[in-house]
């Protein structure tokens, strides 16, 4: 979920545990995102573009054990379901999307650890307003609330529908002081390190 703290955690894991961050690649040569903001009929081609781009990025990252991702292809379906429920996808388009999604993800390598970041909605909206990105502000509170609600069953979806052996770690980040509280940061890093015992936790001044 946007503004939940994903990038903060990814950067923390990179700096303190030595992971390489796979930057989110955004390919939009046809300006589909901008077209979608002006006319929702572009939702389907836009989301297909995101799905294929994120899938290619995930394949690249999964070739090595050192990469971490801010956002993975697994969560792409959350947006597609939201747009379908909002009437932006036709039934046939949603069916086509699901067929492609299932086909692409059927044989991908499961991540070694999936960190699920939780954050209260009011705190997410406070962060969106605070960082002042106009494109995020312009879509309005109703959109963010719909997306937030769509993300709530996401963990159950991954566990039940994908039928994959994925280890989940849930992290509550509603507290804006988390990253500034050494005891909380250390506890989190130690928990993650249990899944990667070969990694050493670096002190902040060495990161």
Protein language model features and the residues they cover:
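P-loop (Walker A) phosphate-binding loop of NTP-binding proteins
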Residues: 1
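Conserved lysine of the Walker
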Residues: 6
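Hydrophobic positions on the alpha1 helix immediately C-terminal to the Walker A/P-loop
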Residues: 9, 13
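Conserved substrate/cofactor phosphate-moiety recognition/catalytic segment
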Residues: 15-56, 80
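Conserved nucleotide-binding/hydrolysis micro-motifs of P-loop NTPases
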Residues: 26-28, 73-75, 119-124, 175-178
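Glycine-rich phosphate-binding loop used to anchor ATP phosphates in small-molecule kinases
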Residues: 42-109
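A glycine- and Lys/Arg-enriched "phosphate-lid" helix/loop adjacent to the NTP-binding pocket
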Residues: 79-152
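NTP-dependent small-molecule kinase module
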Residues: 125-207
């Amino acid at each position: 979920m946007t503004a939940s703290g994903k990038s903060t955690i990814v950067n923390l894991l990179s700096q303190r545990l030595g992971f390489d961050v796979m930057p989110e690649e955004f390919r939009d040569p046809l300006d589909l995102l901008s077209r979608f903001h002006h006319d929702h009929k572009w939702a389907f081609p836009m989301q297909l573009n995101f799905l294929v781009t994120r899938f290619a990025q995930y394949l690249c990252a999964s070739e090595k054990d050192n990469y971490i991702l801010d956002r993975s292809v697994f969560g792409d379906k959350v947006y597609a379901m939201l747009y379908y429920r909002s009437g932006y996808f036709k039934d046939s388009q949603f069916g086509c999307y699901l067929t492609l999604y299932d086909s692409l993800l059927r044989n991908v390598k499961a991540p070694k650890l999936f960190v699920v970041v939780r954050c209260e909605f009011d705190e997410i909206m406070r962060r969106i307003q605070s960082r002042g990105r106009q494109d995020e502000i312009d879509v309005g509170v109703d959109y963010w609330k719909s997306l937030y609600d769509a993300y709530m069953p996401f963990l159950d979806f991954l566990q039940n529908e994908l039928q994959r052996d994925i280890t989940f770690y849930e992290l509550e980040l509603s507290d804006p002081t988390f990253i500034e509280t050494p005891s909380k940061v250390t506890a989190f890093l130690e928990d993650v390190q249990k899944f990667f015992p070969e990694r050493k936790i670096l002190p902040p001044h060495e990161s």
